Every structure is written in structure tokens, then in C-alpha cells.
UniProtKB/Swiss-Prot annotation:
InterPro entries for the chain: Asp/Glu-ADT_sf_sub_c, GatC
Domain of life: Bacteria
Phylogenetic classification of the source organism: Bacteria, Bacillati, Cyanobacteriota, Cyanophyceae, Synechococcales
Complex formation: Heterotrimer of A, B and C subunits.
Reaction equations catalysed: L-glutamyl-tRNA(Gln) + L-glutamine + ATP + H2O = L-glutaminyl-tRNA(Gln) + L-glutamate + ADP + phosphate + H(+); L-aspartyl-tRNA(Asn) + L-glutamine + ATP + H2O = L-asparaginyl-tRNA(Asn) + L-glutamate + ADP + phosphate + 2 H(+)
GO biological process, one term: translation
Protein EC: 6.3.5.-
Enzyme category, top tier: ligase
Record-given protein name: Aspartyl/glutamyl-tRNA(Asn/Gln) amidotransferase subunit C
């Protein structure tokens, strides 16, 4: 059985960038403890000889051949841009130098 404390819940919430109201900490403590108890049960299951997998059903990508097609909408699209610099969209800077 896991021994989860209120401080453990606060730490997990902090790491996950969650602002948990103090009156919910006890509820989350119990829930997290039950989750970890379930994980302990799963760890005890004998999986010898069972192949590792990431999903129950195989997934494949459906692809199509790329086709280059001429279009006349370039200028129409550029005219709709809130900010434009020549033949390019101008976007706000998001990364610091």
C-alpha cells in the first residue's frame, strides 16, 4: 500500500503547474494513493512471454502521392494576412534571442 501525504500531492500539483485549493488536497491524496495501489497491482502481473506493445490494435498511416498543382490564390492569401512583409506572412516573435 502506498503512503501518499498531502505534501506529496502539493509537490505533484506544483510540478504539473496545478493550483489546487487547499480544501481539495485530502481528496487528491486519497485518489493518488488508490492510483498508485493499482499500479502496484499491475506491477505484480506476470507478463513473461507477452510481447511489448503500445496499443491493442495496429495503426497504419494512410498516405497519398504528393501532387504539385498550380494555383492562383497566393496573392489572395497574402492579402488576408494581418501582417505582411513582401511575399511572406509576418508573425509575432515568440522566442527570445
Amino acid at each position: 500500500m502506498s503512503n501518499i501525504t498531502a505534501d506529496d500531492v502539493r509537490k505533484v500539483a506544483h510540478l504539473a503547474r496545478l493550483d489546487l485549493p487547499e480544501d481539495t488536497i485530502a481528496t487528491y491524496t486519497g485518489q493518488l494513493e488508490r492510483i498508485l495501489d493499482y499500479v502496484d497491482q499491475l506491477q505484480a502481473v506476470d507478463t513473461e512471454g507477452v510481447p511489448a506493445t503500445t496499443r491493442a490494435v495496429e495503426v497504419v498511416n494512410v498516405t497519398r502521392e504528393d501532387k504539385v498543382e498550380a494555383t492562383e490564390v497566393r496573392e489572395d492569401l497574402l492579402e488576408q494576412a494581418p501582417l505582411r512583409e513582401g511575399d511572406f506572412f509576418r508573425v509575432p516573435k515568440i522566442l527570445a534571442e
